[in-house]
């Protein structure tokens, strides 16, 4: 599979760029310390800014890898870093998912966007704008034929974001937090063929 790595992406309101250790103060203050933001995610709120700093320093070492995708979501009008969005191979953390996608090519893994933004930016369409841009980036810069996406059953708002980006519901599955807690999820797929049909010049 041809990968593209984490390159800058710009939308009308947002800049998606690599996260840096210097982003730690805004990441911690705007979303990483908030239990409401992390409620349906795999990780728990950061205890202090040192934890955020340590994570960002570790991520910085991964950016040279072309199969590593992790962006800061920056509000262009203010310069605020208020969230993150990534694409990751969910088979690495959830190997049982291999049995949940009959008919899909899993030879290169199950590549899945994940995102979270600070509460102050909820309800403004920012996540939808970022996810749409990420999907476009993926299909233009890699040769992957599909993307997966999932959300906790109890977090239907995230499903609305996925559907606005073209994802189609496929099945329910159980994912897990890093501490092993099971989270019932709804899983979606977006194929290259369907994506291109949505954005063909004749539409």
Task: Enumerate the language-model features and the residues they cover.
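Conserved GNAT-fold acetyl-CoA-binding loop/helix
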Residues: 38-58, 71
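A short helix-loop-beta-strand connector motif used in the catalytic cores of GNAT acetyltransferases and
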Residues: 57-72, 83
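Acyl-donor (CoA/ACP) binding surface of acyl/acetyltransferases
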Residues: 1-26, 30-36, 72-203
């Amino acid at each position: 599979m041809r990968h593209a790595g984490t390159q800058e992406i710009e939308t009308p309101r947002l800049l998606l760029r690599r996260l840096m250790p210097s982003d730690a103060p805004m990441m911690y203050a705007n979303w990483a310390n908030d239990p409401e933001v992390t409620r349906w995610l795999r990780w728990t709120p950061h205890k202090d800014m040192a934890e955020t700093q340590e994570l960002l320093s570790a991520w910085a070492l991964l950016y040279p890898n072309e199969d590593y995708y992790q962006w800061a979501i920056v509000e262009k009008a203010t310069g605020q870093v208020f969230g993150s969005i990534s694409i990751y191979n969910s088979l690495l953390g959830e190997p049982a998912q291999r049995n949940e996608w009959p008919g899909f090519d899993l030879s290169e893994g199950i590549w899945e966007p994940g995102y979270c933004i600070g509460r102050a930016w909820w309800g403004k369409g920012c996540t939808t704008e970022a996810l749409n841009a990420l999907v476009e980036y993926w299909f233009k810069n890699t040769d992957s034929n599909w993307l997966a996406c999932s959300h906790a059953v109890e977090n239907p708002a995230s499903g609305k974001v996925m559907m606005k980006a073209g994802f189609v519901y496929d099945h329910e599955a159980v994912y897990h937090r890093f501490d092993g807690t099971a989270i019932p999820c709804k899983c979606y797929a977006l194929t290259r063929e369907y994506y291109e049909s949505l954005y063909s010049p004749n539409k």
